[in-house]
Design a protein with these regions (language model features):
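Conserved donor-binding/catalytic core segment of Leloir-type glycosyltransferases
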Residues: 4, 160-188, 195-196
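A charged, aromatic-enriched C-terminal amphipathic alpha-helix characteristic of glycosyltransferases
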Residues: 17, 296-323
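Short alpha-helical donor nucleotide-sugar binding micro-motif in glycosyltransferases
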Residues: 116, 218-219, 226-231
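Carbohydrate-associated surface elements
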Residues: 128, 150
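Nucleotide-activated donor-binding/catalytic signature segment of Leloir-type glycosyltransferases, i.e.
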Residues: 205-222
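Aromatic "clamp/platform" in nucleotide-sugar-dependent glycosyltransferases that forms part
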Residues: 239
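Short hydrophobic beta-strand element within catalytic cores of glycosyltransferases
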Residues: 256-259
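Conserved acidic donor-binding segment of nucleotide-sugar-dependent glycosyltransferases
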Residues: 271, 275-282, 291-296
Length: 331
């Protein structure tokens, strides 16, 4: 197939970690023999003007490339741009924030409804997100499919675990939604080991100087396996997590996890691979940390659970949806 990829997030020289999950799926599709052209934004800078640039690039590439199908990541703005720019059948993948924004901004809801009506198929990265989208945009019912971003099992290999007291790791932004302050308090109440936060955000100052807590700041995505090699348990007790890519990557290396019950993680974290916890329950989070620290190191069950989400298998499932759309049938 000739596939036009449209995305407002894609790795580039200035932002090599921007939309790595988009590039990961694209590589897996290309490895299956498809001809892929991109109309993408590969940097965060530029404000809203960059979306005009994406629109121009999408129109030009669609005219030149004449794709069999268009695959857009994010409902708005990428999906909207793709819906307006290309005549080929459209498949759009929703990742989370694009669905949350539907209820926050009326114009976004209207644009999303247009995209969903235009699309031959809508892919969501979790069943949780699919249900949310179908509730907000009933027109999505009957054309939604759940295919997550998967994990590269060659890049995230099973790793031996270090000895010693429990080493907890959090990978993500230091924001209220990620629930990092409650995680820090629960760790302090646990009273053993270390907790490393990888990332940055507005709550950094409230985490600095706490005993046993380490702040690395932002790191490149290709450095994450090294950090996982020095951890026992990866924690993501977010208030909501549409999917949970960091958890899946951690599990692929054999790391047990502590994950939120709200969102996508319950769909891929079985009891033997980690502990699910109500993100508002601080006492429960303390016990979740304690229980996860007692799981095997490394944890073969975590690796096995992650292997069911191999990016190559996810690409095969996405390929089937794209092919049906390209043939002009509802995918």
């Amino acid at each position: 197939m000739r596939i036009l990829l449209v995305s407002q997030m894609y790795p580039g020289p200035d932002d090599p970690d921007l939309g790595v999950f988009v590039a990961q799926v694209e590589r897996a599709l290309a490895a299956r023999g498809h001809d892929i052209e991109r109309a993408v934004l590969d940097r965060r800078a530029g404000g809203k003007r960059r979306y005009a640039h994406l629109a121009r690039r999408t129109f030009a590439t669609a005219r030149r490339f004449r794709p069999d199908v268009v695959h857009a990541h994010f409902l708005v703005p990428s999906g909207l741009i793709a819906a307006l720019a290309a005549r080929a059948p459209l498949v759009v993948t929703a990742h989370g924030r694009d669905v949350r924004n539907v209820g926050a901004v009326p114009a976004v809801a209207a644009a999303t409804r247009l995209v969903v009506r235009r699309a031959a198929a809508v892919v969501t990265v979790s069943d949780y997100l699919r249900r949310e989208l179908e509730t907000k945009i009933p027109e999505a019912r009957g054309k939604t499919h759940t295919v997550d971003s998967g994990v590269d099992l060659d890049r995230f290999r099973e790793l031996p675990a270090p000895d010693g007291p429990p080493r907890f790791l959090h990978v993500g932004s230091l924001t209220p939604r990620k629930n990092v302050l409650r995680l820090a308090r629960a760790f302090e109440r646990l009273g053993e080991g270390t907790l490393t936060f990888v990332g940055d955000g507005p709550l950094r100052s409230q985490l600095e100087g706490r005993p046993g807590i380490v702040l690395t700041g932002p790191v490149r995505h290709d450095e994450i396996p090294h950090l996982l090699a020095n951890a026992h348990v990866v924690c993501q007790p977010s208030l909501i997590e549409p999917f949970g890519q960091a958890l899946l990557e951690a599990m692929a290396t054999g790391r047990s996890v502590v994950a939120t019950t709200i969102g996508g993680p319950p769909e891929f974290v079985p009891p033997e691979a980690g502990v699910l916890v109500d993100p508002a329950d601080e006492e429960g989070l303390v016990e979740a940390l304690r229980a996860a620290a007692r799981l095997p190191r490394p944890n073969p069950a975590a690796r096995a659970a992650a292997a069911r989400h191999d990016v190559n298998e996810q690409a095969r499932r996405l390929e089937a949806i794209l092919e049906r759309a390209a043939r002009g049938r509802r995918a």
